């Protein structure tokens, strides 16, 4: 009998959801950094086995939105509660469970299996972990609690076995050679944005959006033109840097990552433009693909 189903990953920012997603899928589907709000979209990663197809979805961290971009991010996370066969709620050993009570209340009312994953247990001792398990059990009494360390792959194989046990009998939903629902251009923009998150400080990375204007692939190489949008002229200056040094350095690292991702030579051309207050504009958010509908 073949099993198939949708397994959605939710939780607060910076608890390791994207790292877990990549470990489960076995491929680098979601960008992952130490900064909160790295994931902005809902991203699908598909695991295909002879007797099963597991469709994972990584989602943005749950937060109280301050502007329209964050409202869209929260909508992506809440949509993951509607169409899952199994829900993975990711927390860690230091998180305050009470900070998203509204979202937790929705999780508590779900009738599907909920696996509560306490991540980063490599950063904890037994007493702290025991206290954390007890606290979460009182908050989500119907959830099955599994301690893991996504970064070190501890508990990931056991988690995969448990997920397969919980999936319904079903034919596959996607072709067996399909890995994700996102096109190549999406991963280009995400990899560039990941390097911006790593190379720039403070508010700059959160004010940036990347759009691929041109993607031309041959057997030997890929030629990419990408625009980095910011909200202010001052941010444009910071991204470019003195004599263009900062932009060149970031773009070089992005090109190397893209070559590793695609397995061929990449010619990357980056440009910086100002799109004033794009994070608060519904029209611009729709243009950048932040419509959760």
Model-assigned labels for residue ranges:
Residues 1-75, 79-81:
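Conserved G1/Walker A P-loop phosphate-binding module
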Residues 16, 155, 246:
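Conserved glycine(s) of the Walker
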Residues 39, 62-64, 96-97, 124-125, ...:
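Catalytic P-loop NTPase motifs of RecA-like helicase/translocase cores
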Residues 113, 122-180, 184:
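Canonical P-loop GTPase G-domain recognition
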Residues 184-293:
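P-loop NTP-binding site
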